[in-house]
C-alpha cells in the first residue's frame, strides 16, 4: 500500500453517468433519518477520536452548504475500529435552494455599442444554465455588472445525496476526513486512513445508490442490493448483512453485540472492569483512566467482552508505575487495586466472546508474566549501575538535538538557568544546593534500561533511582516533578502540579531551556505544527510559575541563557531579538491560561502586556487586579486619563525628557503639575508593593478632574515650541507614571463603549 500525506479524492461514479435512483415513495414525502456508514479495514485507535469529531462537524457544514434542513442537534457521529457512522435525524425530504444572484461580466463587456449581448455574456449564461430574461444590471462601487438571477429550486433529498452531478455531499464528506497518514489501495486513487471496504447509505428505507467507493477488491455494493449492505462479525470472518432501514441497521448491530456509540462503549467497558474488580475486593486503578488506556481500548474494540485474570504476586515488588506501564503498554489490560495497593489481578477486554475463554486467559497470563519478568530484570540491571550520579556520567551519549548537543550539556544549562531563579526566589544555601543536585541528575534516568523500555516513565524512574542512591527526598521528588504539569489521576480535576519548591524550580528551568533552545534554532510553533511540544512547555512554565507564585524574572533568565548554545556565537542584536520573541511567546500563553474567577478578558490582558513585563508573575498579578476592578468608576477614570494623555502624545515629537515647572504658566497646568509632583511617590509605592488596585483607584481620582480641566482650558500644541514641549513632557510624565508600572488602560474596550463617567 502506498502511504502519503493527507489528500482527498472524490469517489468514482458507477458507469460515469448520472445513475437512476430506485426511489421508494413512502420515504420521499416526509422527513426521514439519513444513515451513512463508511466500512474500513481496522482503523488505528489513535485516529478514531479525531475522525469521529470531523465526521460530525464536516457533515453539519456540508448539509448547510448544500441547503439541507434539519435540527441543529440532529447530526450524530459514531465510530468503531471498522466503521464510521453518520446519522442525521429528521432530514427534510426536499432540498430547497434559495434564489441566488451571481455576478457576471461588467456591463461594458456584456453588451456591445448597439446594446446586444456579447459572446462574453452569452458564455457566462450558458455556463450557469440561464437566459437573458434572468439577468439584471446592478451598480456598485466596482461599477455596473450583469447579474444572473438563479431561481429558487427544490430537489428531492435522495436525488442529491451521493449524486456526483448534484454536488455529491457524501462523497465530499469522505474526502474531507483527514488523518495523520492516509493510503491508496486501488486504481481509483481514493485516499483514506485505511482502505474503505464498503459503504452503506440509506435515507429512511431508500438506498442512496448514486455513488460507490473506488474499490474493486471488496465489492461493498452489488447490483442486486445497492447501498444496503453492511458487514458484521469478527475481523477474520465478516459477513454481509442486508439492511432494510435505518432502524433495522441499529437492530442488526445490537444483535451482533456491536456497541456503536463510543461514549456508551467506554461506559460499558469501565462498568465491566469495575464489576470484575469488585469480585476480588478491588477497583480499577485510576491511572488506567487518566493515562488513556480506557480511551485506547474503547477505540480498539466494537464488541467488548471482559476477561479477568491474574499474575504472579512476586512482581508486586516493582514500583506501581512500572507495573502499570507494563500492563498498559504491552497487554492493554486493566490493573486492580485495593486500599491504594495493586492486586495481582487484571481485566482484559477482548473483541467478541472467545470460543475457549480459559485458553485465552492462560495465554494472556503467560505473556503478562513474561513481560513483568522482563521489567523486574530491567529494574535489577539498572540498580547494579547505581548510584544515579554514575548514570549521569553517561548522558554525553544521549542526544538532545543534533544542533544543541547532548543531555549532559543540557544538564549544564539547567544549572546555569537555576541561578537567577534561585536568586529571585531567595532560596537558602541548602535549597540552592538541592536545586543544583536536581539539575545534575534530572536527565540521568534516560540512560537506564527501564526508561528505554518505558519512555513515559522518565522522571518517575529517576525519582526511585535517586532515592535508592541515597539522594535527599527533595532531589528525588524534583526529578519526577520536572515533567509536570500532567493530567490528574482519574482524569478529573485540574492538572497535577509540582508539590515541592525545588521541583517547581526544576520544572520551570527545564521547560525554559527547551523553549529557548528551539526558538534559537528558528523552530517556532505554527498553526497546528508543534513537533517538539513547545506550546505545552510554555504553558507549563506559566502554570507552574502561577502555582508557586514566586517571581519569574524573564530578563535575568535570558541573560543566563544567551551565553550558551545556540546563542553563544549570535550577534548581540539578534540575540536580543530572540529573547524578545521567546518572552513574547510566553506572555501570549496568558490568553489561554486557566485563570481563577473572575476570568480576565482579552482586553485586560492586552492592557498589561502593552506595559513592561519582565516578571511573569507580576504581570499576571496586574491582570488579576485589573479584572477585579471591572465596572468600577475608578477604573474608567484611570483609563480615560491614560487614553487622553496617549492621544496627545501620539505622533507628537517629544524632545524634552523632563518637565520644567518654572515654564508652567497657566493655572490648570500648574495645578496638574502640583497633583503629579505631590502624589507620584504614592502611586509608585503602591505599584511597587503590588497594590495595583489601590494604585489604579488613586491614579484615577488624582488625575481625572485636573486633566479634564487642563484640556478644556490649555492648548498643548501651541506655536511656542518650548512651551509645547514642556506641556508634552507633563503629559508623558503622567502617562508613564501608570503605564510603565501597571498597564496601558487605553487598550480596554470600556473606552470604546463611550461610557459616561
Language-model features: locations:
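Amphipathic alpha-helical "coupling" segments that flank catalytic cores
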Residues: 1-4, 21, 28-757
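Intrinsically disordered, low-complexity proline-rich regions
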Residues: 7-10, 14, 22-27
Amino acid at each position: 500500500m502506498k502511504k502519503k500525506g493527507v489528500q482527498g479524492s472524490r469517489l468514482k461514479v458507477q458507469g460515469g453517468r448520472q445513475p437512476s435512483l430506485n426511489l421508494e415513495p413512502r420515504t420521499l414525502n416526509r422527513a426521514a433519518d439519513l444513515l451513512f456508514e463508511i466500512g474500513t479495514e481496522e482503523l488505528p485507535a489513535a485516529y478514531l477520536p479525531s475522525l469521529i469529531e470531523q465526521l460530525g462537524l464536516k457533515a453539519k457544514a456540508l448539509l448547510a452548504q448544500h441547503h439541507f434542513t434539519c435540527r441543529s442537534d440532529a447530526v450524530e457521529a459514531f465510530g468503531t475500529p471498522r466503521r464510521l457512522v453518520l446519522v442525521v435525524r429528521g432530514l427534510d425530504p426536499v432540498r430547497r435552494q434559495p434564489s441566488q444572484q451571481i455576478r457576471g461580466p461588467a456591463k461594458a463587456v456584456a453588451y456591445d455599442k448597439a446594446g446586444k449581448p456579447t459572446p462574453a455574456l452569452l458564455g457566462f449564461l450558458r455556463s450557469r444554465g440561464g437566459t437573458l430574461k434572468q439577468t439584471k444590471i446592478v451598480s456598485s462601487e466596482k461599477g455596473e455588472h450583469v447579474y444572473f438571477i438563479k431561481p429558487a429550486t427544490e430537489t428531492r433529498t435522495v436525488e442529491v445525496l451521493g449524486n456526483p452531478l448534484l454536488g455529491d455531499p457524501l462523497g465530499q464528506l469522505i474526502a474531507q476526513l483527514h488523518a495523520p497518514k492516509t493510503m491508496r489501495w486501488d486504481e481509483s486513487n481514493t485516499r483514506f486512513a485505511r482502505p474503505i471496504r464498503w459503504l452503506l447509505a440509506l435515507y429512511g428505507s431508500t438506498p442512496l445508490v448514486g455513488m460507490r467507493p473506488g474499490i474493486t477488491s471488496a465489492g461493498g455494493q452489488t447490483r442486486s442490493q445497492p447501498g444496503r449492505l453492511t458487514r458484521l462479525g469478527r475481523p477474520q470472518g465478516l459477513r454481509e448483512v442486508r439492511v432494510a432501514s435505518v432502524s433495522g441497521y441499529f437492530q442488526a448491530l445490537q444483535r451482533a453485540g456491536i456497541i456503536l456509540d463510543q461514549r456508551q462503549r467506554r461506559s460499558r467497558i469501565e462498568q465491566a472492569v469495575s464489576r470484575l474488580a469488585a469480585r476480588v475486593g478491588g477497583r480499577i486503578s485510576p491511572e488506567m483512566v487518566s493515562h488513556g488506556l480506557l480511551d485506547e481500548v474503547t477505540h480498539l474494540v466494537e464488541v467488548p467482552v471482559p476477561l479477568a485474570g491474574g499474575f504472579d504476586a512476586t512482581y508486586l515488588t516493582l514500583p506501581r508505575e512500572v507495573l502499570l506501564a507494563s500492563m498498559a503498554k504491552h497487554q492493554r489490560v486493566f490493573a486492580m487495586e485495593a486500599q491504594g495497593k495493586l492486586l495481582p489481578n487484571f481485566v482484559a477486554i477482548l473483541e467478541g466472546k472467545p470460543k475457549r475463554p480459559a485458553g485465552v486467559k492462560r495465554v494472556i497470563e503467560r505473556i503478562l508474566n513474561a513481560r513483568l519478568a522482563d521489567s523486574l530484570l530491567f529494574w535489577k540491571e539498572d540498580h547494579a549501575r547505581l548510584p544515579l550520579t554514575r548514570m549521569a556520567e553517561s548522558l554525553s551519549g544521549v542526544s538532545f538535538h543534533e544542533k544543541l548537543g547532548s543531555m549532559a550539556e543540557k544538564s549544564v544549562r539547567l544549572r546555569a538557568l537555576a541561578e537567577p531563579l534561585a536568586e529571585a526566589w531567595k532560596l537558602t544555601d541548602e535549597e540552592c544546593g538541592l536545586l543544583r543536585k536536581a539539575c545534575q541528575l534530572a536527565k540521568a534516568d534516560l540512560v537506564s534500561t527501564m526508561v528505554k523500555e518505558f519512555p513515559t516513565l522518565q522522571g518517575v524512574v529517576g525519582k526511585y533511582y535517586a532515592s535508592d542512591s541515597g539522594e535527599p527526598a527533595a532531589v528525588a521528588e524534583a526529578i519526577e516533578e520536572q515533567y509536570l504539569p500532567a493530567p490528574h489521576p482519574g482524569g478529573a480535576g485540574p492538572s497535577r502540579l509540582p508539590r515541592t519548591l525545588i521541583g517547581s524550580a526544576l520544572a520551570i528551568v527545564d521547560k525554559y531551556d527547551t523553549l529557548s533552545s528551539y526558538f534559537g534554532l528558528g523552530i517556532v510553533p505554527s498553526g497546528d505544527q508543534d513537533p517538539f511540544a513547545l506550546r505545552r512547555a510554555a504553558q507549563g512554565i506559566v502554570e507552574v510559575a502561577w502555582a508557586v507564585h514566586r517571581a519569574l524574572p524573564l530578563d535575568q533568565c535570558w541573560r543566563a541563557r544567551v551565553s550558551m548554545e545556540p546563542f553563544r556565537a549570535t550577534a548581540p542584536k539578534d540575540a536580543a531579538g530572540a529573547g524578545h520573541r521567546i518572552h513574547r511567546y510566553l506572555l501570549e500563553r496568558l490568553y489561554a491560561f486557566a485563570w481563577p474567577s473572575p476570568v480576565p478578558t482579552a482586553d485586560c490582558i492586552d492592557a498589561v502586556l502593552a506595559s513592561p513585563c519582565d516578571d511573569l508573575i507580576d504581570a499576571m498579578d496586574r491582570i488579576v487586579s485589573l479584572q477585579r476592578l471591572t465596572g468600577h468608576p475608578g477604573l474608567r477614570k484611570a483609563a480615560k486619563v491614560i487614553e487622553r494623555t496617549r492621544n496627545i502624545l501620539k505622533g507628537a515629537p517629544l524632545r524634552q525628557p523632563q518637565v520644567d515647572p518654572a515654564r508652567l504658566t497657566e493655572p490648570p497646568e500648574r495645578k496638574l503639575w502640583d497633583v503629579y509632583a505631590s502624589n507620584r511617590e504614592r502611586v509608585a509605592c503602591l505599584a511597587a508593593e503590588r497594590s495595583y488596585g489601590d494604585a489604579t483607584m488613586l491614579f484615577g481620582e488624582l488625575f481625572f478632574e485636573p486633566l479634564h480641566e487642563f484640556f478644556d482650558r490649555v492648548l498643548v500644541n501651541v506655536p511656542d515650541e518650548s512651551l509645547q514641549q514642556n506641556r508634552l513632557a507633563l503629559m508623558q510624565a503622567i502617562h508613564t507614571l501608570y503605564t510603565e508600572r501597571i498597564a496601558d488602560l487605553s487598550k480596554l474596550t470600556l473606552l470604546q463603549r463611550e461610557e459616561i463617567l
